[in-house]
Amino acid sequence: MVANTHTTLLCFSNLGQVYWLKVYEIPSAGRSAKGRPLVNLIQLSEGERITSMVPVDEYDDNHFILMATKSGTVKKTVLTEFQNQRKGGKRAITLEEGDELVGTTVTDGNKFVMLVTNAGKAAHFSETEVRSMGRTAKGVRGIKLDKEQHVICLLYTSDAADEVVS
């Protein structure tokens, strides 16, 4: 992740909330420091944890936030939907009971997406197949899962022929 001190970090939680954090609000520390818990910087609720952070320098209509949930749902929302900040966070995606947000990324709308499951199953598709939705929408199915399977990772590439190794 590359960011300067005025970059905003969009912090997405497992419960589908988004929180905003300016890089300059994160205390500086040496490389041997223990760090500081995010709950001291962001107001998280009980059982909530940050699953991904996305740096944003500028909000525009040409970029999107792509999200994936544990149940295989994907959602693409225009970046400008996230520019109005609230201290207590905002809903980024509406989740079904028992579902969790597992990954997010900023895209230009033309990337290729890969969803990977705990069983080693993967689905690779063009992001153009996912239409843009409002901030509180639920999303669409990105991968069909068998019982006991869940998505563990969201990856993206700029070309269908790119090799993805994780």
Residue ranges of model-derived segments:
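Single conserved hydrophobic/aromatic residue that forms the stacking wall/gate
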Residues: 156-166
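Elongated, amphipathic alpha-helices that form coiled-coils and helical stalk/scaffold elements used
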Residues: 94-101, 144-148
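Duplex nucleic acid-engaging cores and interfaces of nucleic-acid transaction enzymes
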Residues: 1-81, 85-86, 97, 102, ...
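Membrane-topology segments of multi-pass transport proteins
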Residues: 106-108
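Extended intrinsically disordered, low-complexity coil regions enriched in Ser, Thr, Gly, Ala
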Residues: 81-87, 123-138
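Intrinsic, low-complexity N-terminal interaction/targeting segments
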Residues: 150-153
